[in-house]
Structures are given as C-alpha cells and as structure tokens.
C-alpha cells in the first residue's frame, strides 16, 4: 500500500498497481529468502478484486456504447489481423533471437490466452518454465510500458497521479454488501457459463445487465479500486518467485523485444483505425495491446475511456487466440 502512495507522489502512472508490482517483483527476485518456502500469492484474494473491476466495467455498459457498433467491423477486423501478425512476430523473436525450440517459441509468443497457452504448450512438450515466464512477462511488460508510454505521449501521467479518478469516493458503506453479493454472483455466472476470463467477465456481464435494464447502477468507492490495483500489482510481481536472475533477465529482454514489436504493430493499426473511425488513438492502442483483460481495463479507466469498449475487444482477442491455438495444435498433432 505504501508503495502505491509513493508511486502517486512521484507521478507514476497507475501508481497503486505499478508501485506494488515493482516492490513485490524486487522482493521475489532480490530477497526470495524473506518469503515462506513454496510461497504463492493467494489466488482467491486476486479473484475477489478482479470481480470488483468487472463490476465497475459492466456498470459502464450503457446504450451509448452500442452507438459505436457501426465501427466494430473495422475494429474487430484490426484485432483479427493483430493476433495473427503479433503471434508471428513473437515466434520469430523467441525462436531466432532467443534460441527457443519451435514448440516453446510457438506457445510463448501467443498474444493472449495465457493459461490456455501454458496448458496446451505443456501437453505439446514445451519448456514449461520458459513458457510460463514469457507469458507472464508479456503481461507485466505491457502493463508497465503502456501507461509509461502514454504518459510520455500525452505529456502527463495517466491514472490517479494525474488527478483522474476511476470511481466515486463518496459511496456509502451500506452499498458494500450489495457490491460483495454482486461480485460473488458474477463469479458464479462466469464459472457456470465458462466465460473467457470468467472471473472478470461474469461480474461484468451481471453489472451490464443490471445497468442496461435500469434495475441497479454500481458505484465503486475509490479506495476499493485502489485496493484492487494493489492486489493485482502485487500478484503480478510475485510471479517472479523461484526464477533465477539470469533466466529472468534474459526472459525480460526477450519479452521487451516481443512486446515492443507487438505494440509497434498496435500503434500502426491504431493510427489507421483513427483515420477510419475517428476514435482516439490512445483508446485504440489500449484496445489492441496484448496485455491482460483486467489490467488493460484499468488503463482504460485511468484515461476515462469507456472500459467496456476496450474489454469487448480484449475478450475477442483472447477467444480468437485460444480458438486459433486449438486448431493449430490439433494440426501439429496430426502432422507429428
């Protein structure tokens, strides 16, 4: 928590996520002996706060969102193009620059579907340690580089350090039980329907339905949003636990090269889409970036862009990546 306030004081973008991410990553790599043996960040705690972000995003789904639907053929088409080209670029970097074997390079370079990529890659004989490392580093590099890059481009830090708020600070405490119930209900919905990234899209779908019907509108207090960022940032940083420094440094260099190539592709597509749709370039770039759904939604919220628009495209990116991965995996198995 303290690292979040320090990040805010020095003008760090998304300070309550990037501050804890930096400190927890430092502890996991430089001071691993300070952690309990076999320590893993509690995933149930992470899921609870992802559900809260899902509720926030779902509450932003209004009829106005569908007024942009005539642009969706172009934006979804751009995401489709991005997935194929980004995967090819990542594979080339991991295979030829990193020297990874073809199977590890293939599954490590997917621009989405983190858990599915790891599961299918392990079954196909990939180096699981390197595969997991590169997939988590992809998200961490995007989450770190994108807000910093946008801050430099816009000339001011994005997020709460820039004075932007992502929620109302004056939500009454009496609303908290309702928020908790809705979050639990959304988690159950995501599990039953097996939604992609269901821990967030389930609560998002529930909040969107309640918002569109006018039955209920969710206002999440700012302190709870800050807590969610702290938990998510710490969880990402703790992913470095157990990795040797040499392996991690080499993996980080490869991740920066791969993400740099993918984001460059995203910038080009965002500029082209801006000319065709009139949508802001920064919002389009966030929509195309190969980061985690939850983290990219937080970046969108920090820019006061509609996170529902961004999230819909990220869900499509993940579904498309996983479907393509499944088809190619079956083809590789038949060929092999």
Each model region followed by its residue ranges:
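Membrane-interfacial helix-loop connectors
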Residues: 225, 240, 251-253, 259-316
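Alpha-helical membrane segments and immediately flanking helix-loop junctions
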Residues: 97-137, 279-313
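Membrane-interface helix termini and inter-helical loops of multi-pass transporters
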Residues: 62-72, 153-170, 215-220, 246, ...
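Transmembrane alpha-helix boundary signature
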Residues: 32-39, 57-71, 88-101, 271, ...
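Structural signature of multi-pass alpha-helical membrane transport proteins
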Residues: 1-43, 52-64, 174-244, 264, ...
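Structural signature of hydrophobic alpha-helical transmembrane segments
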Residues: 9-25, 45-49, 71-83, 104-109, ...
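Cytoplasmic-side transmembrane-helix entry/capping segments in multi-pass membrane proteins
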Residues: 18-19, 40-53, 73-78, 99-110, ...
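Membrane-embedded alpha-helical segments of transport systems
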Residues: 82-83, 111-117, 132-154, 265, ...
């Amino acid at each position: 928590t303290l690292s979040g306030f320090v990040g805010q004081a020095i003008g760090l973008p998304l300070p309550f996520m990037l501050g804890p991410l930096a400190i927890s990553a430092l502890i996991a790599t430089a001071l691993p002996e300070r952690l309990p043996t076999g320590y893993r960040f509690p995933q149930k705690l992470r899921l609870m706060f992802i559900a809260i972000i899902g509720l926030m995003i779902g509450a932003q789904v209004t009829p106005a969102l569908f007024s942009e639907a005539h642009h969706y053929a172009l934006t979804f088409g751009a995401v489709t193009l991005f997935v194929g080209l980004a995967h090819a670029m990542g594979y080339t970097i991991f295979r030829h620059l990193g020297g990874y074997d073809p199977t590890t390079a293939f599954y490590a370079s997917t621009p989405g579907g983190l858990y599915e990529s790891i599961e299918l890659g392990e079954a196909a004989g990939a180096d699981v340690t390197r595969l997991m490392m590169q997939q988590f580093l992809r998200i961490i590099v995007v989450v770190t580089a994108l807000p910093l890059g946008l801050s430099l481009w816009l000339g001011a830090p994005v997020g709460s350090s820039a004075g932007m708020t992502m929620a109302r600070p004056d939500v009454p405490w009496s609303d908290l039980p309702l928020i908790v119930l809705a979050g639990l209900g959304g988690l159950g919905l995501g599990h039953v329907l097996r939604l992609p990234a269901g821990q967030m899209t389930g609560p998002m779908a529930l909040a969107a339905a309640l918002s569109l019907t006018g039955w209920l509108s969710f206002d999440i207090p700012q302190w709870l949003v800050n807590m969610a960022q702290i938990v998510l940032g710490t969880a990402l940083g703790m992913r470095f636990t157990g990795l040797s420094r040499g392996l991690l440094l080499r993996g980080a260099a490869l991740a920066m090269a791969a993400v740099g190539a993918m984001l460059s592709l995203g910038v080009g597509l965002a500029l082209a889409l801006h000319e065709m749709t009139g949508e802001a370039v920064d919002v389009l770039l966030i929509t195309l970036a190969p980061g985690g759904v939850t983290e990219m939604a937080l970046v969108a919220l920090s820019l006061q862009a509609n996170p529902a628009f961004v999230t819909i495209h990220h869900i499509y990116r993940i579904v498309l990546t996983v479907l393509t991965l499944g088809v190619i995996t079956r083809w590789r198995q038949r060929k092999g």
